[in-house]
Amino acid sequence: MTNIRKTHPLIKIINHSFIDLPAPSNISAWWNFGSLLGICLIIQILTGLFLAMHYTSDTMTAFSSVTHICRDVNYGWLIRYMHANGASMFFICLFLHVGRGLYYGSYTYFETWNIGVILLFAVMATAFMGYVLPWGQMSFWGATVITNLLSAIPYIGTTLVEWIWGGFSVDKATLTRFFAFHFILPFIITALVMVHLLFLHETGSNNPSGLISDSDKIPFHPYYTIKDILGIILLILVLMILVLFSPDLLGDPDNYTPANPLNTPPHIKPEWYFLFAYAILRSIPNKLGGVLALVLSILILMLFPILHMSKQRSMMFRPLSQCMFWILVADLFTLTWIGGQPVEYPFIIIGQLASILYFMIILLILPTISLFENKLLKW
């Protein structure tokens, strides 16, 4: 009798995805982040579900319901801080996962890559709306500032913003709909993740060398299941250290003050994982230009398959491209730092230079260096 795992219509799909999946024999720890993102998503959905049981999406009670969760609900503080810091872990894994894709040329699987970029947008939207829900000062003003950016769209901008707000300012209607969207989006993300994996399994995984690995494949289980479990243990360890020792390390103290439309905080800034994009937005004096730059800073990822000029897929054997890649990473760290600083000299000019460098490296310098490296191959 054949094993049920290979014949049962449903178990067969799981088997081909996680057990008998042929995987390259040389994929490094950088390939762990896909499974870690899956774990992050599961943690976020579960903790979010339990938080939703006690949260009320009303402007009068939202802030106090979060206080109630932390004070009165059994282990409510743990669930709340796991959810808040879980989002940070999610984005750390996301950035490393995308960085891995850029370094090793995984973007040449362009269906998988483009769905990944859509996933990135969806996760960013979910995180933004989640940040609004506790209804603290930074929640309210962050929502006001970011939704207001849509008013830069010519002709329909103002109408669009008021339509999203459900009134003439961020109020009860906005909070209620943000809660509804924040609840539904993770399930849409889960569906997109399945499509992401579907396209990935059509081609098989890339590997550090960027070469075709069909001649040397190993089964996913037990080799990569055990490797993933190690990654998961480390992820949960880091998350729990963060949650139990310094849960507010990555948060904003202003969010412990209830939302007050009459009092603007001195420095409005988003969570740390949006600061690089926020810095790019602020570095352009024109409102519409800033919004376009903000969207393009993420959307530009979709251009990587077109901008790939090298004869080699991976950067493993391309030292000049490697050097430029790490300069890009340093530039993103600089942008993240600038995004958290006030708008004054010298931060304005540093932000503008870092923003120009970001787009120049991706659109001009990396493709040019790739062409130069192709020439070097002939020497």
From Swiss-Prot:
Record: residues binding heme b b566: H97, H196
Gene Ontology molecular function: metal ion binding; ubiquinol-cytochrome-c reductase activity
Keyword Transmembrane helix: yes
UniProt record, GO biological process: mitochondrial electron transport, ubiquinol to cytochrome c
Residue ranges of the TM segments: 33-53, 77-98, 113-133, 178-198, 226-246, 288-308, 320-340, 347-367
Sites where the protein binds a ubiquinone: H201
Subcellular location: Mitochondrion inner membrane
Cofactor requirements of the protein: heme b
InterPro entries: Cyt_b/b6_C (IPR005798), Cyt_b/b6_C_sf (IPR036150), Cyt_b/b6_N (IPR005797), Cytb/b6-like_sf (IPR027387), Cytochrome_b (IPR030689), Cytochrome_b_C_euk/bac (IPR048260), Cytochrome_b_N_euk/bac (IPR048259), Di-haem_cyt_TM (IPR016174)
Manner of cofactor binding, per the entry note: Binds 2 heme b groups non-covalently.
Cellular compartments per GO CC: mitochondrial inner membrane; respiratory chain complex III
Keyword 4Fe-4S on entry: no
Keywords, in A-Z order: Electron transport, Heme, Iron, Membrane, Metal-binding, Mitochondrion, Mitochondrion inner membrane, Respiratory chain, Transmembrane, Transmembrane helix, Transport, Ubiquinone
Chief location: mitochondrion
Pfam families from the UniProt entry: Cytochrom_B_C, Cytochrome_B
Top-level taxon of the source organism: Eukaryota
Chain positions recorded as heme b b562 binding sites: H83, H182
Membrane topology summary: Multi-pass membrane protein
Family: Belongs to the cytochrome b family.
Misc. comment: Heme 1 (or BL or b562) is low-potential and absorbs at about 562 nm, and heme 2 (or BH or b566) is high-potential and absorbs at about 566 nm.
Quaternary state and interactors: The cytochrome bc1 complex contains 11 subunits: 3 respiratory subunits (MT-CYB, CYC1 and UQCRFS1), 2 core proteins (UQCRC1 and UQCRC2) and 6 low-molecular weight proteins (UQCRH/QCR6, UQCRB/QCR7, UQCRQ/QCR8, UQCR10/QCR9, UQCR11/QCR10 and a cleavage product of UQCRFS1). This cytochrome bc1 complex then forms a dimer.
Cited function: Component of the ubiquinol-cytochrome c reductase complex (complex III or cytochrome b-c1 complex) that is part of the mitochondrial respiratory chain. The b-c1 complex mediates electron transfer from ubiquinol to cytochrome c. Contributes to the generation of a proton gradient across the mitochondrial membrane that is then used for ATP synthesis.
Protein's UniProt name: Cytochrome b
Species: Tamias quadrivittatus
Gene designation per UniProt: MT-CYB
